[in-house]
């Protein structure tokens, strides 16, 4: 899929590990952000509706042929049922742990659901990588990252990343390997290069 945009003109933050959330002027009013648009409304606004089977990998490229995003698809076999299994498992674990809209981990700027983080971060002013694991939910997070269906999702994402963005992947891998060779830090999914994972338990 080719889009009429130049990736070199995208907004970018200066920090090496800082996200750039976008300008407020581009995000619209509170009502704009909360509105649920229909497909017809989005098309009228200039969006293009692209049919996709959800399985076949499709790269999205800018006007110079640079890959800027990928619809990574999914592997063949029982992957779809495993995704549903992982979803149900996460829902049950969240419910059994008392997580919901009214819990302290509840609604936040990303949605009306609790989010738990596990892994390693270098943010929040830390001079070196530190663990993200919340002490009160360690057992829950250990069960989540240990679940076979969740592990398969992580490994597929890891493989897709390495296939479609090999140079960035190699940089991630080098940092990952260096960090874990020097520091005793948790690793969510052995064999993958992602430092952290966010579990949306809504």
Where are these regions (language model features)?
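Fe(II)/2-oxoglutarate oxygenase catalytic core
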Residues: 1-201
């Amino acid at each position: 899929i080719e889009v009429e945009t130049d990736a070199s003109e995208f907004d970018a933050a200066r920090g090496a590990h800082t996200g750039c959330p976008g300008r407020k002027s581009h995000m619209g009013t509170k009502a704009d952000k909360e509105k649920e648009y229909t497909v017809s409304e989005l098309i009228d606004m200039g969006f293009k509706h692209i049919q996709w089977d959800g399985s076949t990998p499709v790269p999205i490229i800018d006007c110079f042929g640079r890959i800027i995003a990928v619809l990574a698809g999914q592997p063949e076999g029982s992957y779809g049922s495993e995704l549903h299994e992982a979803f149900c498992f996460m829902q049950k674990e969240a419910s059994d742990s008392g997580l919901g809209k009214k819990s302290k981990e509840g609604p936040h700027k990303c949605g009306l659901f609790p989010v738990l983080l596990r892994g390693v971060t270098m943010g929040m002013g830390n001079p070196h990588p530190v663990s993200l694991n919340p002490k009160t939910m360690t057992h829950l997070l250990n069960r989540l990252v240990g679940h076979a269906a969740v592990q398969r999702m992580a490994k597929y994402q890891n493989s897709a990343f390495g296939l479609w963005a090999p140079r960035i992947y190699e940089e991630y891998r080098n940092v990952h390997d260096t960090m874990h060779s020097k520091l005793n830090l948790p690793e969510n999914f052995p064999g993958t290069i992602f430092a952290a994972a966010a579990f949306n338990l809504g």
